[in-house]
Amino acid sequence: MRNFRSCATLKRIGITLGDCAGIGPEIVDLALKSARLPDSADYIVVGKYPDCSLGKPTLETARAAAAALEEAVTRARRDELDAVVTGPVHKAQMYQAGFKFPGQTEFFAERCGVKNFAMCLTGGKITVALVTTHIPLNEVSGALKQDEIVRVGQLLVDFLRCRSYESPRIAVAGLNPHAGESGKLGREEIEIIEPAVAELQSAIRNPQSAIEGPLSPDTVFHRAAEGEFDAVLCMYHDQGLIPLKLHAFHEGVNVTLGLPFPRTSPDHGTAFEIAGKGVARADSMIAAINLAVELAKKRKRA
């Protein structure tokens, strides 16, 4: 692993390994040995991890992963870290170990006292943000609210501007097939999404920015990948994650919007079945670290 002397010019990037029985330790090690990380950061592995059998998660490995998250968020809130990158965890094991959150996104938001947050994923030419996240598909329609679409859309605009998109172009995906076909295939577009898009358009101060939608979900991601849009605002979890992973499976990054510090993670799981076999790829972890460094450099402190 590379070690850098801490100084004022280096951004301090805390990295958790996730569940140490998975590929987390392996991909972090590969990433820190890679020439694809900038030298403008100090990379700090956070947490204490037990000896374990690779591929065999236990409650002990889950508790260690949870404790590492607690340490990382505490140090970031104390301004001891400029950004946090989290390794993959096994949610079922985490729940058994007492973890009370749907995912790491919700954990960081609660620990930071943040209500206005969102899940965003980026990879290749596609960036998506999710209006609803970890809920059953049959609850999505009831959970969609105009103010939530506007709230997440504004966070997405801020994120894109932070990444130097001065005039972001955002597509808003419809919920139903063909964006509802003028109400024939569902009323959510007419009653919820269209008013939210209009409100977003009026809230964006830069007239060169574009908020367009609701657009048919079956073509909007192709249009984004072709460069027509900088991001897609999605109504539910798999609407955004399926095209992103199809387009950029090995480079996808999860980033939590709205936190007081950058938090990213690779967009994949623990992969217990290949842990320790020397076949795990670190591309997504490398991308997550690079994005954390980029955002840390642009971070505005209160």
Where are these regions (language model features)?
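Residues that scaffold the ATP/ADP-binding catalytic core of kinase and kinase-like folds
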Residues: 97, 111, 140
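A glycine-rich helix N-cap at a beta->alpha junction
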Residues: 105-115
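Conserved hydrophobic/aromatic beta-strand scaffold that supports enzyme active sites
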Residues: 107, 119, 128-130, 263
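Contiguous, glycine/small-aliphatic-enriched amphipathic segments in soluble metabolic enzymes
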Residues: 1-105, 145-201, 208-235, 239-264, ...
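A generic structural signal for well-ordered coil/turn residues at beta-strand boundaries
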Residues: 116, 124-127, 249, 268
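Short, hydrophobic/aromatic-rich beta-strand segments within well-structured domains
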Residues: 118-120, 234
